[in-house]
Structure formats: structure tokens, C-alpha cells
Amino acid sequence: VKKQGNLSADALQNLLQRLGIRELQQKYPDQLSGGQKQRVAIARALYTDPKIVLADEPTAALDSDRVKEIGRLFADLAKTQHKAIIVVTHDLRLRQYADRVYQLMDGKISRKAG
């Protein structure tokens, strides 16, 4: 992996390890499963070390274990690196990792929690 983002080489390798894609660095996109592509997309979004992350359905195509890993990763980034992580999802399993949850109904906030 060539260094082009804002993360150090060690931080990048740690991120790839946490996402379970470190071993995929030499593969071509057409060799990846849907879930692997999703995790690569998350790594690409985090590679520039943004202060705000807007993730639209970040757990699509992921199994339950990977959903937990992504939830823990986002929660950890919010707490330790003070990042704002905004997740738009239908996957209610991610609620447990959120500080606040807003439910939308007909384009309006219908419920707040947290």
C-alpha cells in the first residue's frame, strides 16, 4: 500500500487489520466479495483521516460479526479520535454503538434516543 492519505503507514495497517482486509492488498476489485468491497470502501473513507464521517448503509453486505466490528470501530474513532460519525442505516444492530439515534418517518424525526 502506497502512502497517499493522512494516516501513517502503521495507522493504515492497523485500520486494514481491524477491518479484516489487510490480506487483500494485492487483490483486484473483481476478486473481492461484496462484503470485502464494502470494508475496502470504509477503509478508503477513513484513509484521509477525516474529522467527520458520513456513512450511508456501511454494513450492507456484511455478516453479523463484521457489523459488530464496524460498530466498534466507529465508536472507537468517535471516542478516541473525537470524530463525528454519522451513520444512515436500516440496520438496527448498529444502535448499540451510537451516542444518539434519530428515527425518521416521512422525512421528519419521529423518535430520538440517547
In which residue ranges do the predicted regions lie?
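Helix N-cap at the start of a conserved alpha-helix in ABC-type nucleotide-binding domains
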Residues: S64-R66
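Conserved catalytic motifs of ABC-family nucleotide-binding domains
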Residues: D49
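Catalytic Walker B motif of ABC-type/P-loop ATPase nucleotide-binding domains
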Residues: V53-D56
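Conserved ABC ATPase "signature" region
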Residues: N6-L24
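Conserved ABC ATPase signature
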Residues: Y28-L32, Q36
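Helical segment within the ABC ATPase nucleotide-binding domain
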Residues: K68-T80
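Hydrophobic anchor residue at the start of the ABC signature
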Residues: I42
